[in-house]
């Protein structure tokens, strides 16, 4: 027989961002615990609110299965010595089955006698096993934890009650001074405590006390109520998934309402209004039918519709206070020219080991000028870059960004427009921060892309030069995100940048023009290049390339993200072609021969030493590929497909490791040329060939 098992942890209000992940953790740990203890069940359903983490184990077996089985042990000659005494092997076998040597008997199997025991064990009751739920609670982890009273135990928030019901039976799990029972708590202000007769009563019992325990149901209620409001007023609302998740986990009984503010505040940039509403107050901003931001907002209260007018008025008052501040900051900032703010940047620290923001911008200017030539950026766009790189951090010292730090770059764009800067310059100020997250939007302009790469590259060079290198577990300055941003922008723009090749030139340009420490030698430069190159793997994983393709292309000596991606595309595209396996096997054979011979000497191939026409054919084919300076990775692969029969014929017709040392080395030199070309695609030996 089976019963449903309910387990609820009642707490003080938890931060919204930990609720969903915490109840999932509780379910996952319980699932593992039940499986380890041999208790079968159908599924585990989760419930969660800011004040509770709950699981309902559906169709849980009432007890473990009984054990009735015969266990085979060591042969008799190992189980007993010549005098018939039990050996350690026999004793260990019996002990491992929870029995003694008195329980051992012997039976013959294929001419040999073996030790056996008959194990009969009654399964434990589920209620006994579920007493261990307290250990699951103790094992849970959180970003931040609290202690209460004089206990050493830590949890995300103090625990006030627990419910533990197996069907209608209480399983009295105990943690500190809290003993689980059948009483749960309703809404803090609208509901009362409620005694549950059965585990299955949980959801409906809480609804009667103004608690919607199912998070998905609460989310659905919020969405439906928002849509009703929107339809009534012909509004549009962008439902931010993160904000929706947050407000769902802030309330137990959601009621949606609309508020408004004075139209005069609409002169403030939209991003400021949205930040004030969404980030500070957890409101949804509202747009008219044409997508223009209007002076209304939508919010969610934790309660019913009683006294809703008072709630609306209170929320409007709080928002207007924020908007008054924003209006003041905006008006103050507009009083000054950009040069006023730029001049202050020499006194703003980028990092105390690196220098000022002004010095950082100066280095970015140098890096961008260098990269602009590499990327063949137009003269007009480089003129815009020169201007924006001299000013783009100015908004860091504005009043608005001082209050709304998340708007750095955004306010710079708006203030630059107000002072008459070119649109390319204004937009690039905002885009210098992009992408703002791992998979965030990329710059839309060439100038913005160049500025963003130069800014991120200087940041990485400067921090590495100062010895502040990320560890495997710690990256306080988000250098990995910066490196990944560089890779994504390069790939998006189609810009070729073999980082290991350009770093020495860049550092030479920066030398003597900055007080910041720079990488001191080739080893330090290579560390930076490898750090950036490692982020290419992240992009390939995001684009769902096969693991062996990723391993292969990253094992090459190729440094240019564009070429690495091209190699991955080519190998992935042709992976299932009929000729893929023979091509890869031929090239891998060459690699293995060179490794075995330990041949790395890039000597010139001497055609006078050729002894067979196959050598001439291979030489001609390889030379044709080498001489094509515009050869793409895709065309290189096609070239190898055509060359594959030639390579096979070469192996059939020649002894590579010839007795004549000159002939042997000449043939190895030929193979090395092939291998160097193949290396542009990757280490093909890492490919899984079917």
Curated annotation (Swiss-Prot):
An example molecular function term from Gene Ontology annotations: glycine-tRNA ligase activity
EC identifiers of the protein: 6.1.1.14
This protein's GO CC annotations: cytosol
Cross-referenced InterPro entries: DALR_anticod-bd, Gly-tRNA-synth_bsu, Gly-tRNA-synth_heterodimer
BP term (GO), one: glycyl-tRNA aminoacylation
Signal peptide from the UniProt entry: none
Subcellular location per the Swiss-Prot or TrEMBL entry: Cytoplasm
Keyword vocabulary terms for this entry: Aminoacyl-tRNA synthetase, ATP-binding, Cytoplasm, Ligase, Nucleotide-binding, Protein biosynthesis
Pfam families listed in its UniProt record: DALR_1, tRNA_synt_2f
Domain of life the protein comes from: Bacteria
Catalytic reaction equation(s): tRNA(Gly) + glycine + ATP = glycyl-tRNA(Gly) + AMP + diphosphate
Family: Belongs to the class-II aminoacyl-tRNA synthetase family.
Subunit structure: Tetramer of two alpha and two beta subunits.
Protein name according to UniProt: Glycine--tRNA ligase beta subunit
Gene name as annotated: glyS
